[in-house]
Amino acid sequence: MGTEQSRGAPLKPLDDPTPLTGPTIDVGVRIGWLLRMARLTAPERPAHRLGDMVTRLEWLGLRTSTSSLHRIETGAVRDDRVVAAYEEALALAPHSLRASIDIVCRTFPYSPVDRAPVHRVASPEEMSRLHEPVLAGDAVGGQWREWARAMAQQGNVGLPVDQARDRVSALMGELVRSHGTSYLIRYDALATLRRSAWGGVVREAAEAVLADPHVQMPNDVMSAVGEAFDDDTRSWMVDLLGDPRELLVEGAAIGLGVMAEAHAAPGFWAPVLDRVVAHYNAVAQDQGERWRWLSHVLRLVPADELAAVRGDVAHPPSPVGESLRPAGREALVRACQVHAEESSAALGLPYQPLLARLLFEVVGEGRSSRSHASALLLGALPGLRRVAVDAVLSIAESHPDPSVRERATSRGASLVHDYLPPTVRRRLQEADELSAREAAWLAIAGEQVDEAVLRRCLRTSDQLFGPGRVLSVIGIAGSPVLGEILEEPGWSDEVRGAAAWWVRTGTRLVDPQPGATDG
């Protein structure tokens, strides 16, 4: 795809200088790197020289210079106007770069501040235009995001609270079944509302979602709720750690992780740590997913705070694979570097050390908020997403440490979207038996999953409910098996309830690409 250059001189590849798994990351250099990768790897119109990009942006009415773009592409400056112009000039999905950057910058409160002036809706007519597709129920991702950003601005023409709550619930229903840029744009819309005066409405809508006894996909909703901190919501999430439904324990753990990262204040855990320990102690050692997620929450607590209550912890937390421990991490780091070398070459670029760092965080970072943010950056661009899928699924299939394979298998699903490596696709399509996670890769990629394989999974797997599990595969795929479950005798109330939830919620959602036509 060409050589990255500015005025004829090769640009030095960017890297994050902060310690691996340390307390902070360099957000600025990451978002600058994403913009550089967008310019160099755009599938239709890459710009291999900064001077070429300056010319394109001038065609769009944005006057700039190579030195200004260099500062933006190295993370020294953050400017949403330039990000929007990159999307247009490079023919990328509208809002894809802006949404991913906004999400990452919200997650880490020490992120660079956007110097672009906030666009304010200037008239009731403009606000009505933004309301229209949302109220009609046919908004695509970018329309959801524009609506949410306008709603979040004080003084705009909003909606009655009940109507707003209904629309937020609809957004949540779309979020949990969307993938790729369709997902990240909707997530940004929901998180934007959560961080606004409408945050309480988002919390109420989330409570209603979780009140359904058969809810199947709570994690993304809980993650978005966790983007804003208040004592009551923190307490509510801690209470959910004791919920009898394992799915909600997982969702609460993820929400608390995001809240702790985004809040970034010392003493976040102190007011609730005794209750966290009590929930942990109520679960027997080796008690499956519940024990694993409660162990995950304990690991989120700073070491000095956890040390103060360690004597109250009834038994050791779930083990971490050797390759995920500090002492054994070097081999996984090197594996990610090798994949980054191969991926960089596939993109026509010199070795990108920041790509290796992001790959490691997807598969090796214990904090789900960190891995989620890294996956969003890798998933924002078609070329990056493909090489990241190649790398993560290779680790999932071949790494010697089973704990690494399990984590890569699970987290790889967030990157798959519309692409599977050809060898992986062929193997899965020809297999008579698949794990739930493997079947999920096919379903998320929009590939047909054989009904006989799905039924075999349904009758033999112990992973039926929740993200990446058998019923989510059947639901995302829109398989006729869903309706058959509701008609056939012999299925448990829990299985029937989950199938009915998917029928109500809908199947895989991906926004139409700009310029696509029907037929």
Question: Each PLM stretch: what is its role?
Answer:
Residues 51, 67, 95:
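Key DNA-contact positions within bacterial/archaeal DNA-binding proteins
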Residues 47-58:
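Short alpha-helical "recognition helix" segments of helix-turn-helix
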Residues 106-177:
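Helix-turn-helix/homeodomain-like alpha-helical modules used for DNA recognition
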Residues 56-78, 101-105:
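Recognition helix of helix-turn-helix/homeodomain-like DNA-binding domains
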Residues 1-49:
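A short, Lys/Arg-rich alpha-helix, primarily the initiator
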Residues 164-517:
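Extended amphipathic alpha-helical coiled-coil/heptad-repeat regions
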Residues 25, 91-107:
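Short C-terminal boundary/hinge segments that cap the last helix of small helical domains
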Residues 76-97:
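DNA major-groove recognition helix of helix-turn-helix/homeodomain DNA-binding modules
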